[in-house]
Each structure stands twice: as structure tokens, then as C-alpha cells.
Amino acid sequence: MISQQFPKHVENQWLALEIGNSRLHWALFMGESLKFTWDTEYLPESVIQQLGNGETNWELGTGEKGISSSTFPPLPPAPCPSGSQSLMGETPKTELSHPLPLFIASVVPKQTALWQSYPNVRVITLDQIPLNNTYPTLGIDRALALWGAGMSWGFPMLVIDAGTALTFTAADGERNLVGGAILPGVGLQFASLGQKTEQLPQVEMAEIKSLPPHFALNTAEAIQSGVIYTLIAGIRDFTEEWLSLFPDGKVAIKGGDRILLLNYLQALYPELAGRLIVEPNMIFWGMQTIVAGVA
């Protein structure tokens, strides 16, 4: 691991930003404590410049040049004084003399480049994560999630990330990367069938209220059946293989589709579902250990 000097925290607060394939994922830390998380769409360069000038949601407003509070929640620019509301409620309007330190983990280089104008930014890279046996093209999101989960619940650890892609990433008890797998996630599989074929309909996630029949009698449910049951079978296969290799190993799941897939696993394989650690913020915990210098 390469040691690196990180920017000084302003009033012990700092921002973590995971730039994903579809959205931005944010966290506000106070020291080592995670206080608040939220998601936004990708932000225009003008808004990034405003944030870099220390302007919070209160100053950004809701006009064409700003961003609404529904998209970017208020960030307290200083620790809440006695008598003020918590981070989850209203916070005092105070101007930042300096923008909060920002630590970025990104899998989208074009988006990363936009944030270089932010004056107090640091991009976390793979060589800063103390995993052994990594390879150069291992995604920073996979590595940080694995590191965060392992440091929180112990190694050996298998992390399942149910996002745009469904990924499996594992490390043994000595923090050596065992390896993993990548396949299209739930939404991407539905989208590919809907967009790349002439007659198959686009199935939306919101349309799925319960497990479809295995052998469907209409096209929409046939697509649901094919995607869902093969994904669940894949999760079961990888998890069982992992536990056969590492009987004392742990399995954690994250990602935007984690609850959907967990519900299906609970219905079909409740014992297996009961072994899963459900934690959406593994990447942020991994970032926190890197920022704090914990290894």
C-alpha cells in the first residue's frame, strides 16, 4: 500500500463520494462516524464548481444554475451547536469558509475528471487498499466494499454487490484476494432484452410484485422468471461454493437491488438468506478505514 497525505478535515467533517455507473453515492462523516448517506444523479460542472466554492444547498437554490434540496440534501458546514437539530433534521444556515474535504472512489473516469476542480479533493486508488494479490483492473468499488466488509465483520469475506452489475468479490483470512465474478444485474438484464430485441417487452422493476412462476404463460412473466431464477441460482451457487472453501467465511450483500434479491432468497432459500450480512455502506466503511489510516 502506498502511503499518502490526505487533506486536513474541516471541523472534523468530510465527504465520501462513490461515483457509480449510474449515479453518485454520498456520505457525510464526522471523524470516523458515518452520519448521513444519500444518492444523486450526476451533477453538472457548474454545480461542482459551486460546491467547490463552499456553497451548500442553502446557497445553491433551485434555479437553473443550482440544484434542488430534493436532489442534494443540506450539509451542515460545522458541527451542530447545542440546541440545534441533528443531521437528519434541519440544520443552521452557515457559510463554509472552505469546502469540506472530499474523498472519491470512482469507476467512471469521465466523471472523476469533472471533480478535479474541487479544491479539497483526493481520489482513492487501488494501491492504497491493503488487500493482497489484487490485479490492476480490479474495480475500486469492489476492492473498497470487500475491504470495508472485511474490516467490519472479519475475513474471510465474500461481498455480493447487487447493482448495475452483479458482482462477487472475495478475500481469505489473510486478506488475499481470492477472486470473483461479474454478470449483468437485474435491471441491466431486463433492459438488454427490451432494447436489443424486436418483440420482447421492456420489463420494469416496479412491475414485479412477487416471484413469478417458473414456467410462465405470458412473455413478461417469462422474462421475469428467466432473469430472477437464474440470478438467484447464481447467488446460491457462488455462496455455497464460498462456504465450502471457507466454512467460517462470511457473506455480505450491498447494492441497489439487495433488498429485492434478499426477499427472493428468503422465499426460496431462507437458511441461506439468514447467513447474509446486509449493509449498503460497505464502500464508505472501506473509504473510512483508508482515510483514517487503519490497516
From Swiss-Prot:
Keywords: ATP-binding, Coenzyme A biosynthesis, Cytoplasm, Kinase, Metal-binding, Nucleotide-binding, Potassium, Transferase. Its EC number is 2.7.1.33. It catalyses: (R)-pantothenate + ATP = (R)-4'-phosphopantothenate + ADP + H(+). Pathway: Cofactor biosynthesis; coenzyme A biosynthesis; CoA from (R)-pantothenate: step 1/5. A monovalent cation. Ammonium or potassium. It is an enzyme of class 2 (transferase). K(+) binds at D161. It is found in: Cytoplasm. The active site is at D141. GO terms for molecular function: ATP binding; metal ion binding; pantothenate kinase activity. Its cofactor is NH4(+); K(+). Pfam families: Pan_kinase (PF03309). GO terms for cellular component: cytoplasm. Gene3D superfamilies: 3.30.420.40. Homodimer. Catalyzes the phosphorylation of pantothenate (Pan), the first step in CoA biosynthesis. This is Type III pantothenate kinase. It comes from Trichormus variabilis (strain ATCC 29413 / PCC 7937).
